[in-house]
UniProtKB/Swiss-Prot annotation:
It comes from Homo sapiens (Human). The modification N-acetylserine is found at S2. InterPro entries: RidA (IPR006056), RidA_CS (IPR019897), RutC-like_sf (IPR035959), YjgF/YER057c/UK114 (IPR006175). The modification Phosphothreonine is found at T74. This is 2-iminobutanoate/2-iminopropanoate deaminase. Catalyzes the hydrolytic deamination of enamine/imine intermediates that form during the course of normal metabolism. May facilitate the release of ammonia from these potentially toxic reactive metabolites, reducing their impact on cellular components. It may act on enamine/imine intermediates formed by several types of pyridoxal-5'-phosphate-dependent dehydratases including L-threonine dehydratase. CDD domains: YjgF_YER057c_UK114_family (cd00448). GO terms for biological process: L-threonine catabolic process to glycine; lipid metabolic process; mRNA catabolic process; mRNA destabilization; negative regulation of translation. One of its GO terms (molecular function) is deaminase activity. It holds the Pfam family Ribonuc_L-PSP. It comes from the Eukaryota.
Length: 137
């Protein structure tokens, strides 16, 4: 059996890891993107303006990682959204649909006790590299 190729994806246009993990890992055509918070990559600080601005920055960071892997948001097939307050769910949805416009990825959303650096939101994703064709059932 031939081995699959595993490659670390990294870009300076998204925040560096704040622990022992990679921004993303590509295995074959599947990209596993680590959770992104609303951290400005140049300052290393959370953006101000509450959960909406943090969500925008987290998704912008994710977009840069996707771009580094030769992808965009249309390649994303699954996301997990972690919220410090589940009452922010509707606000986050309004931001989320600015980045995911159709053929939405599968998703789970959870309220958690705390997030890194006091963030209000963290989003992780799985994407498939290369062209994708949407089939109708």
């Amino acid at each position: 059996m031939s081995s699959l190729i595993r490659r670390v994806i990294s870009t300076a246009k998204a925040p560096g890891a704040i622990g022992p993990y990679s921004q993303a890992v590509l295995v074959d055509r599947t990209i596993y993107i680590s959770g992104q918070i609303g951290m400005d990559p140049s300052s290393g600080q959370l953006v101000s303006g509450g959960v909406a601005e943090e969500a925008k920055q987290a998704l912008k960071n994710m977009g840069e990682i996707l771009k580094a892997a030769g992808c965009d948001f249309t390649n994303v097939v699954k996301t997990t959204v972690l919220l410090a307050d589940i009452n922010d769910f509707n606000t986050v949805n309004e931001i989320y649909k600015q980045y995911f416009k159709s053929n939405f990825p599968a998703r789970a959303a959870y309220q958690v006790a705390a997030l890194p650096k006091g963030s209000r939101i963290e989003i992780e994703a799985v994407a498939i590299q290369g062209p994708l064709t949407t089939a109708s059932l």
